């Protein structure tokens, strides 16, 4: 019988899913294919990965408040799709805090986990798109890095087709977002800039693949470490884990993603979908995470509701090859070559723990440096582990930037931590709470944090700027973007 705390976690997850569509009637406020910024110029395919095709300065919109970063830019850049031989393009958003360190860059990976164009990080920062509550959470955890003075680059790592679950593509696009950011002369980044990455859940798909592909695809990048948790390292394993659960809509989103970028998968899927299946994929292409989950809970991909082959729907050589290609850790040459910090709840209800643990073990056998923390308490789930693990993940990256050596080899440890027990969290408690409360408004920079009361103005920054913190209803008004568009 579930405990009261287990029921509380379930109620909390459902509350978040139900709450944000109510906030986010701005979810219908789509980016729009007619936005000229997202259209690449002629001959873009002849450019090199990481080459900037276009850029603009933006006034970033933040869902929970106005964070007074010093500058923000968006870059359209050349990248790759499923292989290095398939040209593609996408966008990254750069956030520059006050007194930014010009020799440090952090790539932040958002758990978009959906296929609608309004769900991308760039749409969130440009249009204040509130339709993806996970973006709201990730935005909050990025505060720790910005507060430290780290410049952040946050790619639309699902590409223009918003191909959720196409992990290799996400890895290429993330590595090329780093290249593009380093190429952006306005930042004046040092030639020896050190780089790290942070992400969770869908963001860990991205960084798991970026860390795996970096040695062969982008060996020149001075990446010093990665932190990611709740890692969906095996696509088929994740599908089987959430099939028939309240999170089963994620399966349709993932099928939509790989269908839209793998032509051979698209060809097969079209032969097995029924009308409800085609409708489901089209719904996913136009909506964000919580809308998809609320539309398709407790569904089984192996039933005949969406397709005509039942439990044999994935019993196809092409599909099986794709699942193999999208499993981390099975190819020795795709092993991270810098330290990695991973964390995962043993009882994760969305992403299977065993798959992530197996990937970490495989990487270790091939010479990686992996520090893996298991949160074993039976009350620790996917969302609570994201919060609890965010501070150790940040400390791991900060220690690397501060020159702390990471011991050779791998280290697997278990913590019987319960998030709501402050004595267990110890010193982490205030930092976690501050990071979450920070969403209500603060000046971002290493000189110190100022939490602003709602509807107040805090003045006196070095740059002469001020921080306005709005009430919730004020923050969620759509404001015309003030941006400068330049061709590279």
From Swiss-Prot:
Activity modulation: Inhibited by different metal ions including Fe(2+), Fe(3+), Cu(2+), and Zn(2+). The monovalent ions Na(+) and K(+) exhibit less dramatic inhibition.
GO function terms (MF aspect): triacylglycerol lipase activity
The enzyme's main class, written as a single word, is: hydrolase
In this chain, composition skew of type Basic residues spans 469-480
Cystine residue pairs:
119-288
Induction description: Not expressed in laboratory conditions.
First-listed, main subcellular location of the protein, grouped into a coarse class: secreted
pH relationship of activity: Optimum pH is 5.8.
Signal sequence bounds: 1-26
Pfam annotation, one family: LIP
Sequence segments annotated as region (Disordered): 461-488
Q: Does the keyword Secreted apply?
A: yes
Give GO cellular component annotations, separated by semicolons. Answer: extracellular region
A biological process term (GO) from this entry: lipid catabolic process
UniProt keywords (A-Z) are:
Disulfide bond, Glycoprotein, Hydrolase, Lipid degradation, Lipid metabolism, Secreted, Signal, Virulence
Glycan-modified residues: 183, 316
Per its record, the protein catalyses: a triacylglycerol + H2O = a diacylglycerol + a fatty acid + H(+); a monoacylglycerol + H2O = glycerol + a fatty acid + H(+); a diacylglycerol + H2O = a monoacylglycerol + a fatty acid + H(+)
Q: Where are the active-site residues found? A: 201 (nucleophile), 348, 382
Thermal behaviour (record text): Optimum temperature is 40 degrees Celsius.
Question: What InterPro entries is this protein classified in?
Answer: AB_hydrolase_fold, Lipase_secreted
Q: Where in the cell is it found?
A: Secreted
- Record EC number: 3.1.1.-, 3.1.1.3
Summarize the protein's role. Answer: Secreted lipase that releases free fatty acids from monoacylglycerol and triacylglycerol but has no phospholipase or lysophospholipase activities. Has minor esterase activity. Due to an absence of fatty acid synthase genes in Malassezia species, secretory lipases are essential for the yeast to generate free fatty acids from degradation of sebum and assimilate them as lipid sources for growth. Plays important roles not only in lipid metabolism but also in the immune response of host cells and pathogenesis. Hydrolyzes lipids, such as Tween 20, 40 and 80, with Tween 80 being the best substrate.
Q: Tell me the protein family, please.
A: Belongs to the AB hydrolase superfamily. Lipase family. Class Lip subfamily.
Per its record, how is this protein called by name? Answer: Secreted triacylglycerol lipase LIP1
Organism, scientific name: Malassezia furfur (Pityriasis versicolor infection agent)
Q: What high-level taxonomic lineage is stated for the organism? A: Eukaryota, Fungi, Dikarya, Basidiomycota, Ustilaginomycotina
């Amino acid at each position: 019988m579930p405990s009261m705390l287990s029921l509380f976690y379930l109620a909390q997850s459902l509350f978040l899913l139900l709450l944000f569509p109510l906030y986010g009637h701005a979810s219908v406020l789509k980016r729009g294919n007619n936005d000229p910024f997202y259209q690449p110029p002629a001959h873009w395919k002849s450019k090199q990965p990481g080459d900037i095709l276009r850029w603009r300065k933006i006034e970033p919109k933040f869902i929970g408040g106005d964070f007074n970063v010093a500058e923000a830019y968006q870059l359209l850049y050349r990248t790759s799709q499923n292989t290095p031989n398939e040209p593609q393009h996408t966008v990254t958003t750069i956030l520059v805090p006050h007194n930014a360190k010009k020799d440090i860059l952090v790539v932040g990976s958002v758990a978009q986990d959906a296929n609608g164009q309004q769900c991308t990080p760039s749409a969130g920062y440009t249009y204040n798109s509130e339709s993806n509550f996970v973006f709201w959470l990730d935005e909050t955890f990025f505060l720790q890095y910005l507060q430290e003075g780290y410049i952040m680059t946050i790619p639309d790592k699902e590409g223009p087709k918003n191909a959720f679950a196409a992990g290799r593509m996400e890895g290429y696009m993330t590595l090329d977002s780093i290249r593009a950011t380093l190429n952006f002369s306005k930042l004046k980044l040092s030639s020896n800039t050190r780089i790290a990455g942070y992400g969770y859940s869908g963001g860990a798909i991205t960084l798991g693949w970026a860390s795996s592909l970096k040695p062969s695809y982008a060996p020149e990048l001075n990446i010093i470490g990665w932190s990611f948790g709740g890692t969906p390292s095996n696509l088929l394993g994740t599908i089987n884990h959430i099939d028939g659960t309240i999170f089963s809509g994620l399966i349709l989103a993932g099928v939509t993603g790989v269908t839209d970028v793998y032509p051979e998968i698209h060809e097969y899927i079209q032969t097995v979908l029924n009308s409800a299946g085609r409708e489901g994929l089209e719904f996913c292409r136009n909506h964000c995470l919580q809308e998809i989950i609320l539309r398709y809970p407790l569904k089984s991909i192996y039933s005949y509701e969406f397709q005509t082959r039942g439990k044999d729907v994935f019993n196809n050589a092409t599909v099986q090859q794709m699942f193999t290609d999208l499993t981390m850790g099975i190819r020795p040459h795709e092993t991270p070559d810098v330290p990695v910090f991973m964390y995962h709840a043993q009882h994760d209800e969305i992403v299977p723990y065993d798959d992530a643990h197996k990937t970490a073990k495989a990487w270790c056998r091939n010479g990686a440096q992996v520090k893996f923390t298991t949160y074993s308490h039976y009350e620790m789930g996917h969302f609570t582990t994201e919060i609890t693990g965010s501070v150790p993940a940040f400390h791991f990256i900060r220690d690397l930037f501060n020159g702390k050596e990471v011991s050779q080899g791998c280290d697997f440890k278990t913590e019987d931590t319960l998030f709501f027990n402050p004595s267990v969290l110890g010193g982490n408690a205030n930092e976690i709470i501050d990071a979450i409360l920070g969403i209500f408004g603060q000046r971002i920079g290493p000189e110190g944090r100022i939490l602003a009361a709602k509807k107040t103005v805090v003045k006196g920054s070095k740059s002469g700027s001020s921080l306005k913190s709005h009430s919730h209803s004020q923050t969620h008004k759509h404001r015309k973007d003030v941006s400068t568009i330049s061709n590279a």
